[in-house]
Amino acid sequence: MKYWVRMNKEELQIALLLMKETELTGVLKVDPDFEPEKSKIDEMIRKKFLKQEDSKVSWNPFVKMIVWSVTHAQSVLKINIPNKALRHIYFYDEIMILLSKDHEEDIYTFYFVPVLPEAIGGLANTLEELKEIIPEKGKAEAKKIPILSEKEKELELTEIISEINDIDVVAEHFEPIVVNSDIFGKHDVQNVVVKMQEIFWWVERKDENVFFYPVEFYELMEFTAKKIVRMHGASIAFKRKGMNV
């Protein structure tokens, strides 16, 4: 099966209207004067968004789930990275949808990522692979902070990060995000991802030192999405609960 839906601006407006929505937050507002031609809707019915069964027209359930999820997202992460197509990440229930937009044309692509517990549960143990996406420049810029106190030696990595006082070495503010042992289940996780001063860092504990490696956020999200899909595939794609569409 496909894990994405691609549409142009007009198709997206029609899809929103069919869902009785007039806005995709931060991305597109349907023009109040927009009245799609019947031929355009028929084209969508025939080719892309709707399917014909027993002489009845109904939504393609995958497309409906995508549009429903982005218009009813419980949280939205906005991305503003120059020269990158990724614009928004939507979270609804147990799924994540990445939205990219072509720079030259009004082409929107929604990538579906199942973030069910069984999908993300095993991902924490594969974070070592993040080293593969850290460029040599990032490895050279790694920050090393020694664990000095006996108290810190007994703490979990996320607790150690909270105890770090040498803020000049790393940053003035940080917060756990995307990948940590709380989100990814109960695992013996020795690395996390944190955000500090608008930079994302992969944090690793080695013996009595903590290392911070800068990670490019777009590549981080792409890695995470591909890993989930590759690990679990179509078998979990439609295990939906609590979504009345």
Segments and roles (model prediction):
Residues 1-45, 49-66:
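Short, amphipathic alpha-helical interface elements at domain boundaries
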Residues 51, 57-245:
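Non-catalytic recognition/regulatory regions in large multidomain proteins
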